[in-house]
Design a protein with these regions (language model features):
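Alpha-helical bundle segments enriched in helix-capping/polar residues
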Residues: 1-105, 297
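ATPase nucleotide-binding head domains, primarily ABC-like/P-loop NTPase cores
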Residues: 59, 66-297
Length: 297
């Protein structure tokens, strides 16, 4: 073993001297570079083919992972923006609740906290993106336009850019409005809690006009809000839907089923009760909420 190791070290040493004297590595490198230049187009085609195969394999794996999926259908009419899907679900949720969607006009979504509004918006946008990219939709049926997809969800303030939360919201909305002007291709947008970074009166006023303007400009908008006033102000241009909650004593559960019409329930204080906050806090909160509701009406 020692002799063979010594012979190996000697051969490696001689090879190193050989490379240093005759520049063998450089000669080989430039030889390969010459081949690459000659076969440049073939190599680019090979790389593109390899990438396409990897994408197709990934798509097949994704489809195998899904409990069910459908190949999407798209409208031929350029002015058709309708979004239709049956038994649609979010692919990243285990044992998801499926919902139907059939919208040719905008949707305003209300409902209590944790009832499923944000997840529904993500489901709508994500499945449209999957349909337009890998021809795969998590539903039993899907037919829609080919959209430019935008969202204003899960926003955060930016310390690096010096933007407050409200400024980030404004920029996000402006991005959607600018997109509408940039092309004739229909825009699909999802908006979660419009302008929640400001006071109630201005939020309701600005949200009403912003959402109304999106509808007038032909955008297919799915928006979620806790401001029940919007369901009245926008009833002529937005279809009202909501998610319900089921209350049993101190326990609250959610069926996650889309229901026609605006929400009439409130559960924020009930959730405080369910998580064990002092009764004095929740009772006083109930009384104050009822007083404020009475003043608004």
């Amino acid at each position: 073993n020692t002799a063979s190791t010594g012979a190996g070290d000697l051969s490696q040493l001689l090879m190193s001297y050989f490379k240093m004297i005759f520049h063998f590595d450089f000669i080989k490198f430039y030889s390969m570079l010459h081949i690459v230049k000659e076969k440049k187009h073939e190599m680019i085609a090979l790389i593109e083919l390899s990438g396409e195969m990897e994408a197709q394999i990934s798509m097949v794996y994704f489809r195998e992972y899904l409990p069910c999926y459908i190949i999407p259908e798209f409208w031929n009419e350029k002015d058709q923006k309708r979004y239709t899907a049956t038994q649609m679900y979010h692919p990243l949720i285990a044992d998801p609740v499926k919902n139907d969607v059939d919208q040719k006009s905008c949707m305003l979504l209300t409902g209590s906290n944790a009832s499923g509004k944000s997840t529904f918006l993500k489901m709508v946008a994500l499945n449209a993106l999957l349909a337009q990219s890998i021809c795969t939709v998590c539903a039993d049926f899907y037919q829609a336009a080919f959209y430019r997809i935008y969202s204003s969800m899960a926003l955060r303030d930016s310390l690096s850019e010096g933007d407050s939360y409200f400024i980030v919201e404004i920029k996000s909305m402006k991005r959607i409005f600018d997109a509408v002007k940039a092309s004739d291709i229909p825009v699909l947008c999802t908006i979660d809690e419009v302008l929640r970074g400001t006071n109630t009166a201005e939020r309701i006023g600005a949200s009403t006009e912003l959402l109304k303007a999106l509808s007038k400009q032909g955008v297919l908008c799915f928006a979620a809000t806790h401001d029940m006033e919007l369901t009245t102000y926008l009833k002529d241009v937005y279809d009202n839907y909501h998610f319900e909650e089921m209350v049993d004593g101190d326990q609250i559960s959610f069926p996650y089923r889309l229901v026609n019409g605006p929400s009439r329930g409130r559960n924020a204080i009930r959730l405080l009760e369910a998580f064990g906050f002092d009764r004095e806090i929740t009772d006083n909160a109930h009384r104050l909420a009822e007083k404020l509701t009475g003043e608004q009406t």
